[in-house]
Amino acid sequence: MRPILLSGHERSLNQIKFNRDGDLLFSVAKDKIVCAWWSANGERLGTYSGHQGAIWTVDVSPNTVLLATGSADNTVRLWNVKTGECVKVWDFPTAVKRVEFNPDGSRLLAVTEKRMGFLGTIAVLDISYGDSQGGALENQADEPSLRITCTESKATVAGWSYLGKYIIAGHEDGSVSQYDGKTGEQLENVQAHEFDHQINDIQFSQDRTYFITASKDKSAKLISSRNLAILKTYVADTPLNSATITPKKDYVILGGGQAAMDVTTTSARQGKFEARFYHKVFEDEIGRVRGHFGPLNTVDVHPNGTAYASGGEDGYVRVHHFDKPYFDFMYEVEREQLRK
């Protein structure tokens, strides 16, 4: 697996995202710039500039028409993917830590930071796709259609379950909440991780019926969207920043590493700066991919399961296209199932 090294950022990566087709990869970092890349060869398509602060989060609509970003300049910006122009800016009282489109792209959630006397909130914005020619994308609602306020522990990440039925949020205290996608009422709250070890990432399976969390408590959990039942636990030896579920094969990929301030030796091995592959069903670690010089902040997998990308504290994005052995690898039990 020879990685493609994408260097377009001057500072550490915050989030990377493949689009629904998997031909594009979007990356955001602490340097105010959004980059778009061809995922097949790592060529840079272009950049989206306009933010005034570090960009924490990015998401692309299912039809790859709009791109949303959330930043430390307290705004959510909506971009036209094709032309690179900013079509809408929403202002918030505090920084925006996570944005995500619902499965049909008609709504966008934004998680805001708890700061300066403002409580952390999850705001839902209605998204319009203009006329049939793709014009008039500027006509977006000015105010959120729904606001969920996190009175107890602030939400750090959030996402939509299947059909946009629930909003699932991960919190600073290690708990996971389920909210009604229409009314915003809290239906369920589960202490999924150790108390006060915040959840750094939530990523869903392709059908959005379950999701994986990555936490500072050095573990990742597979959780059902319907009732927040914990299905599987993957234990690592380092705090985790990101986790993703691979389609096609039953694996999960975890990314982490010691926080930059805790690193005492800079050997790539020492800080445990590798992407770890675990078997989704059996919870065993099956391999690691090295390469980053610093913690992995974000991992994402190609929607066809043919490649994955990781973004690190070192400012690089690495795209790995899987080789044949990756797809051929099976446990003995899996082979027996096939023989039947």
Curated annotation (Swiss-Prot):
Alphabetized UniProt keyword annotations: Cytoplasm, Initiation factor, Protein biosynthesis, Repeat, WD repeat
GO BP terms: formation of cytoplasmic translation initiation complex
PROSITE patterns reported for this sequence: WD_REPEATS_1, WD_REPEATS_2, WD_REPEATS_REGION
Renumbered ranges of WD repeats: 8-47, 50-91, 150-189, 194-233, 291-330
Record flagged with keyword Repeat: yes
Gene3D superfamilies: YVTN repeat-like/Quinoprotein amine dehydrogenase
Entry GO CC: eukaryotic 43S preinitiation complex; eukaryotic 48S preinitiation complex; eukaryotic translation initiation factor 3 complex, eIF3e; eukaryotic translation initiation factor 3 complex, eIF3m; nuclear periphery
Pfam families for this protein: EIF3I (PF24805)
SUPFAM superfamilies: WD40 repeat-like
InterPro entries (UniProt xref): eIF3i (IPR027525), WD40/YVTN_repeat-like_dom_sf (IPR015943), WD40_repeat_CS (IPR019775), WD40_repeat_dom_sf (IPR036322), WD40_rpt (IPR001680)
Compartment(s) where it occurs, according to its Swiss-Prot or TrEMBL record: Cytoplasm
Function noted in UniProt: Component of the eukaryotic translation initiation factor 3 (eIF-3) complex, which is involved in protein synthesis of a specialized repertoire of mRNAs and, together with other initiation factors, stimulates binding of mRNA and methionyl-tRNAi to the 40S ribosome. The eIF-3 complex specifically targets and initiates translation of a subset of mRNAs involved in cell proliferation.
HAMAP family: eIF3i
Family named by the database record: Belongs to the eIF-3 subunit I family.
Complex formation: Component of the eukaryotic translation initiation factor 3 (eIF-3) complex.
Protein name, UniProt field: Eukaryotic translation initiation factor 3 subunit I
Natural source organism: Neosartorya fischeri (strain ATCC 1020 / DSM 3700 / CBS 544.65 / FGSC A1164 / JCM 1740 / NRRL 181 / WB 181) (Aspergillus fischerianus)
Gene: tif34
